Amino acid sequence: MAEITHRFIQSNGIRMRIAEAGKGPLVVLCHGFPESWYSWRHQIPVLADAGYHVVAPDQRGYGGTDAPPDVESYTQMHLVGDIVGLVHALGEEQAVIIGHDWGAPVAWNSALWRPDIFRGVACLSVPLSPRGPISPLTAMKQTFGDNFFYILYFQTPGVAEHELQHDVRRTMRAFLHGASGSAPDPTPERLANPLKKHAFFLEQLQDSETLPAWLTEADLDYFTEEFTRSGFRGPLNWYRNFDRTWALSGPFQGQKLRQPSMFVSGDRDLIRMNPGYEAQMREVATDLREIVIIPGVGHWTQQEAPAATNDALLRFLRGLDG
């Protein structure tokens, strides 16, 4: 099994910590919230052994990577720029990009905006959707009004940070159990409570002292140590740029994704539970080669089902290079 090594790379004005293994065509893995390169621990050696140079950065604001203080420094333009700069810093001209959760918009947008660099894209949990006619926060406020919705709760700097950083281990356990296939009742209402106008985010998740089978105490220790050190401000700033990114992405309205693409999700993932997601994806992605739905799996796709995820990713990668 390929050994994972770590180093730092200068990219787009920040220093990024990367995990990497293998030699061959470049594959970049973009993690989600609240995670780090470590969420790809089951994929990096497998893809490397299959003949790829696999790189998983801690993204802007996470882990060992720099966390600029300004909220405005976390738009999708910044995040895509980080990955473009990473590819160039590695001495490469092209890459396949794979993203999960928040890493999925980074991957989708990287492929949409820089098709000259990203020759293929596969995303987990968060499907591709066209740019909407109104700003995302406006749409959310129209839908939820004054009721609790986690993305709106995350908007005010300091509020969610205070809650999430109070007991980091409990926070990480609640996230990783509560959004997984191990938790009961995977419905979108878990993250939007129409009965409460004033609520806390962790109240919406179903915590458990018993870890799911796919998560070890050592895994939880790693995530806890990383977020105890780095905090949640940088990661939460990603959520605070929905409208700013929407405004800046106007020139890309109607852009088609023409490179080969794939989508993978668990059938118990509450993020994917929009019945129209496949039609929306096919509206934008003209070469969507496969949609893979993994039974019994929740939001943490590649951690909950590493073998099924690896099989799907290798099938996609070999289709590009076959």
Which sequence ranges carry the predicted segments?
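Signature tryptophan residues that serve as conserved aromatic anchors
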Residues: 33, 37-40, 102, 108, ...
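Catalytic active-site module of serine/aspartate enzymes centered on a nucleophile-bearing elbow/loop
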Residues: 287-322
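Short acidic-hydrophobic surface loop/beta-edge motif
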Residues: 5-11
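Conserved HGGG/HGGXW glycine-rich cap/lid loop of the alpha/beta-hydrolase fold
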Residues: 17-66, 281
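Flexible "cap/lid" subdomain of the alpha/beta-hydrolase fold that forms the substrate-access gate
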Residues: 2, 15-16, 62-98, 102-289
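Glycine-rich phosphate-binding loop signature in dinucleotide/nucleotide-binding domains
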Residues: 22, 90-93, 320
